[in-house]
């Protein structure tokens, strides 16, 4: 990607790699004078977030988060209705990323011979090592637009709770033949947020259990 970012005939770099490469590719692209459009998540921690913000301001290059769920037909239609006052004053909203990845976990298991986390595919590894809603913007993005977040309102309070990892641990055990003692991401995570104007948002994350 470095050779591509250095080319003089390219204005924008569209980044749709694995999560771990979103930040370094975006950083290198802006350092070489390119606008960036990044699939979510655009960064993996707060330091990376601020680095992208500061670099975008310093280089005067756009750094755009491509949260596709903000721009599908259904979401754009709902946003237009909200802005036209069809729903009145929205005081509570829900969003979620509920996507059972049971059919995909085999592809996310890099080394089926053992349970060495260093040999895992990046997505399985991230779910095993990190707790909380690790993919919030599919649900939060459209909701934030409808509630005018950072356009007159802002989130002030957040609390999150998760279930134990039941399916995750069982899946690793069945795949590796060994007990899985550490799987930090719960099967289901629920997050409640309150805004400065008293609105409430509920966000859910679940990639482990089937839903009706």
Stretches with model-predicted labels:
Residues 180-189, 193-212:
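NAD(P)-dinucleotide binding in Rossmann-like oxidoreductases
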Residues 12, 18-19, 23-71, 85:
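Beta-strand-loop-alpha-helix segment that lines the small-molecule cofactor/substrate pocket
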Residues 59-62, 69-183:
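Predominantly a Rossmann-like dinucleotide-binding segment in NAD(P)-dependent oxidoreductases
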Residues 10, 19, 99, 164, ...:
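Flexible, active-site-proximal loop/turn residues at the rims of small-molecule/cofactor binding pockets
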Residues 1-11:
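A structured beta-alpha segment of the ubiquitous adenosine-cofactor-binding alpha/beta core
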Residues 11-12, 92:
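Short, Asp-centered acidic motifs that coordinate Mg2+ and/or phosphate
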